[in-house]
Amino acid sequence: MTDQLAELDTQTLRGMLDDFAKNWLAHDGLWFQAIEQKSGMETAIELDRQAWAKFSAIEAKRIMARHNIAQGSGLEGLRKALGFRMYALLNTQKFANVTDSSFEFYMVDCRVQKARREKGLTPFPCKSVGIIEYDVFARTIDPRITTTCICCPPDSQAGEDHWCGWRFSI
């Protein structure tokens, strides 16, 4: 850590976290658009799936280490970890129907989909990427966890009360 960071107040550090999250998402979007322009949507989505399969495990492991979430910590560990993802800084998320054996996780407000809607574009069809992203993230926390997509674009109900929904079960 640089001396500059050590001297910053909490409000400034929180603002920097917000900036870092926005920059991360902007880079992800620009990378995707560059591939899409060069090779088409199908290739861009396939490469995105490959990248998210690796990144989701890296992100989960770093969150686990930083926040003392044990490997095999079940749904409780996953709920905690989801709150520390970069997305949690950018999007409105909620948990529902929490039981000992499952819970639902919803992305109520999604920065990417909101921007597309404001530009008059159709929702980005992120379901095939999301299935890999959330499954790998959850199984990195605990391999017993199964992930089911409730809805995600291009599903027709996506964007009504939430953009995507996921059920995690043990």
Residue ranges of model-derived segments:
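N-terminal accessory segment detector
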Residues: 1-104, 111-113, 117-129, 139-163, ...
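Long, well-ordered alpha-helical scaffolding segments within enzyme catalytic domains
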Residues: 130-134
